[in-house]
């Protein structure tokens, strides 16, 4: 038999684990039942590491005792007794009268005996949270990991399981049994961090994601809290605040993040189907709120400034979808524009044809140039219709690609957007009242 085949045979032999444990204990290590079994934790199923460790120690007692008391291997019994293994302690005392002192486990120093205690504490602390699924994360002193891995290397142990992995599983099993909740590593609603060394528990509830659409009825209302004075702002609040505050109260959450499919200017209304958004509610204690109640609370508290609709639970993927579509999905607008002089009727009659599926060149608008890089964007106007209201006023209906600067398309931004409505009509723009009336959630 070759050397490689012989080594493989020894590793696969039923007595391989037994021989390794005997050698380790006789070399002066003391291992608790769990740490003993964990040395071969990746071998087989159906046994806990504690059960596996006790089984190995039981077999070693049988080996130590042999055929009769006179032939007993007292040294092997002593090292087994020092691990705290009661059958070995009792047998040693009976055979030799010795009562050896129990040594702390050379790897965990007693930490594996804390699983049930920490699980109970986690269950108690989790009572104030709503959840159906959970997972357990483990923190442990680096010295424990070092001792464990050093033992693996020294004795060539290739099927050992880490104490961190064992603790996560065993504490999770206890919590699941005590609460009836499901242990899940995927999409868990509550992450329970167990610090084995410090004996501490941390709870981290997963965010709740709520999809919806908002209509903005008031001009002068920013989407998010505005950091500096702005003459366009007419209200001491924002769309985000009007939506977030009621949600925090109902979900008993610490904070929330507001994700919208783009944004309208402060002086622009959003009507029609509304603007899609996702509310990411962080560290919620409640997860199963009736969203009709949330919508009513938001709408009644908004005083007519905004309205939310179509609220539904969703997940993080929807945020990515909203962000990715914001620059390409089709949007529709109605703009009421006042010009410097009377509008040419013939030109106005041609405008729909000229700007049907037209590609517009837009440099970064002057009004945002201080905070955005100056670059050229090519965007599409799919449809443009015009209705004359008075000699110098026109109402336009536009359907455009997402990320399109509508105001600049109307007034031209001193040539930074071309072609523009003002350029085509040969007429300067004095004022614009703009409304968003439709935002699609699929690319045009």
Curated annotation (Swiss-Prot):
Any idea of its EC number? 5.4.99.25
Ordered alphabetically, the record's keywords are: Isomerase, RNA-binding, tRNA processing
* GO annotation (BP), single: tRNA pseudouridine synthesis
Q: Which InterPro entries match?
A: PsdUridine_synth_cat_dom_sf (IPR020103), Pus10 (IPR005912), Pus10-like (IPR039894), Pus10-like_C (IPR048741), Pus10_THUMP_arc (IPR055174)
Question: Which reaction(s) are listed as its catalytic activity?
Answer: uridine(54) in tRNA = pseudouridine(54) in tRNA; uridine(55) in tRNA = pseudouridine(55) in tRNA
Q: Pfam families, from UniProt? A: Pus10_C, Pus10_THUMP_arc
Q: Does the keyword Isomerase apply?
A: yes
Q: Where does substrate bind?
A: 333, 405
The active site annotation covers: 265
One annotated GO molecular function is:
tRNA binding
Family the entry assigns: Belongs to the pseudouridine synthase Pus10 family.
Protein task: Responsible for synthesis of pseudouridine from uracil-54 and uracil-55 in the psi GC loop of transfer RNAs.
Know the name of this protein? tRNA pseudouridine synthase Pus10
Q: Which organism is it from?
A: Thermofilum pendens (strain DSM 2475 / Hrk 5)
Annotated gene: pus10
